[in-house]
């Protein structure tokens, strides 16, 4: 770690965090543009975020959003197949893309004087992707192989997939981003083109440019390259089916001979961050850190790993940056000789004790300091800032929400954390899953 960075973080922890240097504007065709200045190095990150993800797919076409992400690296009228990434590499940069339930994003990291070229190429494929049947056949096999390796070949991923399907019986968050295999196998060229032509348009996108740039320069380049693109009149409102009230806890046991380290996971339905109202999500963020954010001092680790010595590891997770309600989760992996049933019982006892007594005040203060440090480190690179703002804006939050978030986290009280804990940590609102070798079954 550089000493200058350490000193800067210590100074920031002692007082209010510095505001990001952000400029925003919208082109006439509806493209939202965010410019984040960071002049420490002559480099720039360009990201284009589309407000379309796996939870927005038409029924029966699971995986089409991720499939299209792969196909976007095929050719256009002006660029041959595979030339996009090759050109980025020839200019000393890197590029990639990713898909979630709520968005699909593409990025390039290059020298600042290559931004003009990157915008030209990214704007070109926004509305002029050309696909052949061979392109689709080849890339469909690629995503099927990806599913085989990352999901079907990994018992933990299969458990996560089954738990999401059990948690979200009506909402599309229960459908895997990569897709169900039988639907992936049927995805066609026309499916991809229909999804692309309807949703990949300036009025459904956010352009983030972060690095050694000036807002006026970015505006001129955006007008030059993205400005002429026609908006889409086929973008649908993000009105997804919502979950009915969950009236009873749900359980599943996945047995797989490949499992060498059994564990249990419980996920509770939990609210998302909402624009202008982020306090409950902030309280849940602090709660996750208190319960399982540290392998030595968190509530679960201290009680299960060190005091009772029944767990090898434990964790808690929550990320409310989503369009709709998502999950708050707990993980526990027992030591050899302790059954999953006993580990679950111990976990429940620890959670019940926490709900009764609340957090240790000194630990609560330490957690907030650690959260503040993590926020500062997360904003320390242009690429990190681009991703931070892009993700938030893609799910309906605002620039102000992003800038307010660190101070909202710091202002959360113990009472707010405990109120959120009592509301969310309800067994009737949860799915509990066991991942185990074939010899251990549910009690």
Annotated model-derived regions:
Residues 20-25, 164-205, 238-243, 270-274, ...:
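Histidine-acidic residue clusters that define the catalytic metal-binding segment
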Residues 30, 39-87, 278-292, 299-302:
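Active/ligand-binding-proximal structured segments within catalytic/core domains
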Residues 50, 76-77, 83-195, 368-383:
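Acidic/histidine-enriched segments that form metal/cofactor-coordinating
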Residues 109-140, 294-295, 320-378:
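M16/insulysin-pitrilysin zinc metalloprotease superfamily fold
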Residues 144-160, 242-261, 302-313, 357-403, ...:
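Short acidic/His-enriched helical or mixed secondary-structure segments at domain edges of catalytic enzymes
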Residues 169, 177, 202, 206-274, ...:
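An aromatic/glycine/proline-enriched structural segment found at the starts
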Residues 206-208, 316, 331-333, 354, ...:
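C-terminal regions of mature proteins
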Residues 265-269, 292-334:
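A structural supersecondary motif
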